[in-house]
Every structure is written in C-alpha cells, then in structure tokens.
Amino acid sequence: MPRRLRPTRLEHVVDGHALRARLSAAALDSIGNEAEQRARAIDILKQALFRGRMIAKERLENGASGVETSRLLSGVTDEVITALYDFTTVHVFRARNPTEGERLCLLAVGGYGRGTLAPFSDIDLLFLRPYKQTPHAESVIEYMLYALWDLGFKVGHASRTIEECVRLSKEDFTIRTSILEARRLTGDERLAEDLKKRFRDEVMKATGAQFVAAKLKERDDRQARAGASRYMVEPNVKEGKGGLRDLHTLMWIAEYLHPVDRPEDVFKMEVFSIRETKAFIRAFDFLHAVRAHLHFTTGRPEERLTFDLQPEIARRMGYGDRGDAPAVERFMRRYFLIAKEVGTLTRAFSAKLEAEHFKNEPKGISRFLPGARPKRKALDVEGFYEDGGRLNIEGQEIFEADPVNLIRLFKIADERDLDLHPDAFTAVTRALPLITSRVRRDPDACRAFLDLLARGKRSYRTLTLMNDAGVLGRFIPEFGRVVAQMQFNMYHSYTVDEHTLRAVGVIGDIAAGRLVDDHPLAVSIMPLIEDREALFLAMLLHDTGKGGVGGQEKAGARSARSACERLGVERSKVELVAWLVENHLVMSDFAQKRDVSDPGTVAAFARIVENPERLRLLLVITVADIRAVGPGVWNGWKGQLLRELYNATEAVFRGGRGSDAAANVQRHQESTAEAARAALLETDPAAKGWVAAMENAYFSAFSQDDLFHHAELARRAAIQGGAAAEGQVRPGSNAAEVVIAAKDRRGLFADLALAISSLGGNVVGARVFTSRQGQALDVFYVQDVTGAPFGCENPRALRRLADALEAAGKGDALAVEPRRGSEQTRAAAFAIAPSVTIDNDASNDATVVEASGRDRPGLLHALAKTLADSALSIQSAHIDGYGERAVDAFYVQTTEGGKVTDTRKLNALKADLLAALEQNEASAPAARPGLRRARASVAR
C-alpha cells in the first residue's frame, strides 16, 4: 500500500494572493480590450486549476487519503472561483457605489458545499441577493457562468433572494438539503448569515421527523434505481447501496438534528461507539479515494466501478496479487466489506435516532416509522420482547450472560416472522467477539442454527440479516472466508456470500412451492428428499472452497466436512454434504456440455451419483445454484437439459443395482421413441419415412407438437431445394428457437453458425440430429446482443434469420463479418486463457472436443469451421457460456463414422482449435486506451 502523506497547506498548491495579483496585472495590461482581458484571465485560472488537480492526483497516487484529496480539490476550486469573482466585480463590472440592492453573496451548495469534491464533479453555486435581480448582479452572474464553463466546470446554479430560498426549501427537500450544506465562498457576509439564521428558524425548526422521513425514502428510491444489493459486482460508488450517498444521508440527518460539519463530528453526538466512529471515518475516506481514482483514471465523472476499471483502480490503490488472490479481487473484497460496514452504521444510526426522538419528539418520529409509537410486547423467551413488530432485547447483557443468544435471536425472529429492531442489530454487531470456538461447538447454538437453516420460514431474509450483522461468518468461519468475495468475471452478478444466500433462498422457495411454474420437476421431487438438512447445509457451504487450495470443489468439500463436524452433524450426513459440495457442478456440466441423449453420458453420470436420493439433491442444488448467479442466467433451455438428464438417470436407477446403466438408458430411449413414433404416425401418416430415418435419441428430446412440425419442415425442405427453416419465440422463453432441415454435408453447421452471427444473433444452445438418409435437423436457441430472444420485438428479423439459414443450408451463405455485440466492450476487461480438451472415453461412438475461450460473435462458426477443415462431422454441439467465456463442446466423427483415434490427428486438431481461440483473444478490442486486462476468474 502507498504510504500515507501528511495533509498539505492549500497555499502551497494554489496561492490565492498571487493568483489575484496575476489576474489584476492581466486586467491592467488589457484595459480597453475586453476580449483579451477575459482570455488572459481564463488562461491564468486554467493554469491554477490544472496545477491544483495534478498535485491532488499525484498526492493521491502517493498515499494521500481520499478525504484529504477531495478537500484539497474543493479548496483549489474555492480559490479559482473566488479569484474569478473578485476579478469580475473589481475589473469587469465594478460597482463603485453599491446600493443595498446590489449586494451579492456567492455560496457553494450541495456536495461542493460540504467542502469535499471529486475531480470532475459538478459544482453547485447559489448567488444570493437581498432583493430582486439588478442589472449589475445579472451581469456579474452571466460573466462568471460563461467563464466557469470555459474553465471546463459543469455548473449547477441558482440566483435567489433569502425569501425565495426559505420558501423553496419548505416545498422541496432537495433544495432544503442543498441549503443545509451551503457554505459562503465570497461576497456579502451578512447575506449568508441572514440566510443561515432564517433557514434554521423557519425551515429546520420542529421539522426533524419530516426531513428524516424524506431522506430515508429518497435513499430507498435511489437504491432501487442503482441496484438494491450492496453486493452487485459493478457497484456505483456514489449512488449504490453502501456507497457514499448512504454516508451523506447520515450526515444530512445528523446535521439537520445536530450541528455536524465533518464526519469526525458524528462522534460528538454519541451515536456510535469509538469502533463504529472509526469505521465511519474509514469508510468515508476509502469511498472518497475510490471515487477520486475513478474520475482521474477516466477523465470524467465516472461513478461505476466497472470491470474494465477495477484492475486499474486496484493498482492505483496499492493492491497486489497475494498467493492465489488476484489484486483486483482483493481490492473488490475490501470495497464490499466497506459497503457492508456502511449498512451496519446505518442501522446503528437509525437505532439512535429512534431512541432519541421517541424520548424528545414522540409525535414527530411516528410520521416516518411504521405505525404509531411502538408498543412493547412480552415474549415467552427470557431477555427478548416484541417492539413495534420488531424483535428487541432487554440489553447487551443477555449476550454477555449467554452468547448462544446471538444465534437464538435470529431463530426467534424467523419463527415469529419479525424483523430485528435497530437496537438489537447494533447490540449484535458490538457483541461479535463473544462468538468464540466454544460457542461454535455449543450443542444449543448448533441446533438452533441448523433448525433455522433447514426449517426456517424465510431463510434468505434471516440469513441475510445474520450475514449483515457479521454473525453468520463468525459462527461459520468457512462461510466467513467468502464474505464480500467477488470473482473477477462477467458470469456472477453478486459476491460469493450474496450468491450463496440467494441460492439458499431459491431452495426455500422451491420447498414452499412458489417456483412451480419455473421449476416443476424440482418442486415435485422436493417432498421425496429424505434429508433436507443436508440439502441446505450443502447449499450454504457449496462455494466455501473458492480461493482455497487444491481446486474449488475439493477445497469446498474439506470446508464442508470441517463445518459439519463442528456443528455436530452425524458422520453419514457429513459425508453426504461433502459429496454434494464436491460435485455441485457435475450435473450442470453433464447437462450443458455433454449429449444427454447419449447412453454413455447418462451411464457415466449415474456412476458418479450412485442413488436416487443424491440425484434429487443434486438437481435441486443445481437449479438453485444457476438461478442465483444473476438475472438472465437461468433459462428454459437449461431446465430442459437438466430434466432430460434427470429422467434418463432416474430410469437407470429404476433398472436396479448391478444392471448395465447404458443398457437401461437405451431401453428407456427405445420405449420413449416407440411411443413418440406411434403418436406421430397417428397424427401424420405421411411422416412414416421421416420417423423411420431418425434415431431414438431424437424422439425423447422434443414434444409431440415439435416432432409434428419437424416432419413438416423436412418435407418442405425436400420440395424447395434442399433446405427449410422457421423460427419462433415461445412464451416465457429467453431465446428464440430456430429450426432448419437441410441435406447434411461437411461444414453445414459452421455455415449455419456464420449466418446467425452475421445477423447479430448469439447462439446459446444447439441440438444437432442427422437421419439415416443424411438429412440434418438442427435446432438453434438464439438471443440478440441485449440477451433477449432474437426477434422478440421484431418478427421480421426472425423471418430474415430463417431465410439466412435456408440460404446457408443450400450452400450459398454470404461471407459476412459477424456483428460485434455491446457485451464485447465489457468483456474486453478480461484476459482469458483459451483451452481445448479432447475426450475419447465420454462417448461410445464419437470423440468429444471441448473448446473454451473468449465469447464473441462468430466464435462458434470459427470452431465449427476448424472441425470441418479437419474432415470431421459434428454429431452434436453443446454451447455454454459463463459471462465473458464460452465453452463449446462438439461430438465429432471421422468421414468413416467413428472416433478420432490417430494421435497425430488429435494433436493437430487441438493445435488448430487453440490457434483459432488465441487469434480470437489477440484480436479482442481493448477496454479503454491505457488500461490493462486482468486475468478472468474461472471459478463458477
């Protein structure tokens, strides 16, 4: 980390006296030439501003604090603006005998009024006058504003009388807040004092509760706009939850109710403990530093800590790689821990406000707290009571007397469907050191926690409260190690702990039947699961191996064993939980990267799973894990693949122990296909040839309606020159389904993939079938560049896509450059190591090739063309994506119809695919000029 620098004196950066002397000299040298006079003044002020900003930037990069930097920038801006004011009122529009009405005062308001300024923030100014606007004041204001714009400032300004300020402050809380922070820069001092007095007496007096209510609502609305979770992996430093604006809100409320000018002064209110006061100052400083670095790095008022900026800000703030922890992830973990602290401070502040105002203003506070004045209601648990619909405690001593109460508190809150009172929450955060190794092994504490986890009414909400308070990570240290941990990739939308708790919440929703429309299979098998406790424990601990030694899955299994043994879980359950954690990615890997219609695939999966109970547990965990990754990650296509794999594996287990798994799958496929063939022929006797030509696996992959339409499409293809295609967007689907029937040939799949990408389509899934007569039927699941179903808003675009596929199917596809999507700019932040694996054991009759690299339009075409150029035919393709990374698996055969067994050909194929992936990586656009990429995390 850079060493801390001592604060510097403002006059060592911008000498106000010397600046004014230079401006006066320039004015005297250019008397009679207003244009030259103005130009020279602007040039002098620009130099001062540039010097001030560069010194602030250099000091920040060498260890100056965030708050010191923001105050220095504010001070530099003060000197420039006040010097401009003096120049304007002395040399340009001098009032030699100013009247009472020509008095003018210039005040900084809003964030600038606080005296803390980010490098490229807007500045808000108030020109205060005693009466109506005079020609002199109007001239001064206009001249100054144009000059400030020429200096590069973005200025928010108002010209008002004191009367107008008071009236508007009563009507508008935004104006009221800006006046609250008003700070005189220059001009008539009496006007500023009069405004301050009238604002305090006529606006602030007896309106504390009203102001608090408005600010809290404003905070809630802002967080809803910016993203309600403080654990979004591209946070808004200013407006996001846990960001600077949350601290500003506390300061506004504090200053409105008490005279507070600096963050350090909050301590004088005795709102926070000494530890909490230090946390407040630490958070305030850290967030100011991050924001200043963001502005200096981008050269503009950038407030979002986007992926492309995170590595550079980490470097500037002194973070380096440490072991397996990259610098960017260490920095972002620090950011999220600070955001978490801000949430804790907000609750502590709320508790203090509530206690103080029920004592001093019993009628006022009720306007913004739920209901009327809270009523105390005794509970049948000693030390706890209900306080206005929230759970509270008799005092801190109940934790000191029995630290297990720190766990019981949350269990009682869950059982009785109560939120925590801010007093109780604050008491918990102050009692965290009481959670020792003895408490972690206490049978009562362990039983209370396990009951809450597996049988809680609202597990996500209660566990989130425990996590926010610091109890969850303290009681389960394995979980504590991933609190606030982010993974530097585009796949995950949340930190590891937030993702985990959301996944636990999804299981709770599945168990309650709330997700039956989205996950009918998971909901239907939930009552059959024998060990719910193992299910919830595995979900809670499934990602605790991230950042561990020996790989995510094995490290996670070790963590799970450690946690379960300490919780007193029986041995057989410990091993089950550890197995689930170690294998929690297996089902999604098999479903999304392998051919689930291949008996060998299902047999291999069944050998890993071993029994129906594990299969049920793994399905629910897989669904919850994928769904909790972030918006848009789960889709119906993934659900369909998981259902197919589950049903096929369940059929294996129904065949009994000792039976041949692959043979069981084959028998299941044969019976399914026989029934589907009969049903299709009954509906469409003309499909007899098509039915006879297709393999069994095809019939278990689609509904009867789909089979009927495919048969019609195949007939159309024969009539209209060898290819026919059609597309549709099914209700509730997040991808368009485009089906093409065409005569199979080498390179067909590559041509089809190129046609899709050339129209801006992104293939998120594909199924490839070939009849015994050489007729191909390929089904593509396609999104547009925004991630929406292709053509969902424009049916003509979907028709154009079908036409393009028909043309490609006939062999006359246009060689067009694939369109670049907007996501490519975000993905440019990551350095992605390509990889290729070739497996000749995964299938009985095909070689499985898996290629992983940077996702981009046209990648699927490039890989498929490489396979075609190697004289290989694609039997099936499985497209998967993890944010910036694509993982495409192909089942391929030689021209003779078998596996690729020649070692030299396998090595050449791997080299060619790696070359295609590496060329793709090398040609990827830069995120921003001058920014370096950081290695993308491969953790899932």
Curated annotation (Swiss-Prot):
Start and end of every ACT domain? 737-821, 848-929
What cofactor does its activity depend on? Mg(2+)
Q: Where is the HD domain?
A: 496-618
Q: Which processes are annotated in GO (biological process)?
A: regulation of nitrogen utilization
Region of interest (Uridylyl-removing), residue spans: 380-736
Q: Which reaction does it catalyse?
A: [protein-PII]-L-tyrosine + UTP = [protein-PII]-uridylyl-L-tyrosine + diphosphate; [protein-PII]-uridylyl-L-tyrosine + H2O = [protein-PII]-L-tyrosine + UMP + H(+)
Q: How is its activity regulated?
A: Uridylyltransferase (UTase) activity is inhibited by glutamine, while glutamine activates uridylyl-removing (UR) activity.
Q: In Gene Ontology terms, what is one molecular function of this protein?
A: [protein-PII] uridylyltransferase activity
Q: Which SMART domains match?
A: HDc
Q: Which InterPro entries does the record match to this protein?
A: ACT-like_dom_sf, ACT_dom, HD/PDEase_dom, HD_domain, NT_sf, PII_UdlTrfase/GS_AdlTrfase, UTase/UR
Q: Tell me the keywords, alphabetical order.
A: Hydrolase, Magnesium, Multifunctional enzyme, Nucleotidyltransferase, Repeat, Transferase
* Renumbered residue ranges of the record's region Uridylyltransferase: 1-379
On whether rRNA-binding is a keyword of this UniProt record, the answer is no
Q: What is its EC number?
A: 2.7.7.59, 3.1.4.-
Pfam families from the UniProt entry: GlnD_UR_UTase, HD
Q: Which family does it belong to?
A: Belongs to the GlnD family.
Q: What is known of its domains?
A: Has four distinct domains: an N-terminal nucleotidyltransferase (NT) domain responsible for UTase activity, a central HD domain that encodes UR activity, and two C-terminal ACT domains that seem to have a role in glutamine sensing.
Q: What does this protein do?
A: Modifies, by uridylylation and deuridylylation, the PII regulatory proteins (GlnB and homologs), in response to the nitrogen status of the cell that GlnD senses through the glutamine level. Under low glutamine levels, catalyzes the conversion of the PII proteins and UTP to PII-UMP and PPi, while under higher glutamine levels, GlnD hydrolyzes PII-UMP to PII and UMP (deuridylylation). Thus, controls uridylylation state and activity of the PII proteins, and plays an important role in the regulation of nitrogen assimilation and metabolism.
Please state what the protein is called.
Answer: Bifunctional uridylyltransferase/uridylyl-removing enzyme
Source organism (scientific name): Caulobacter vibrioides (strain NA1000 / CB15N)
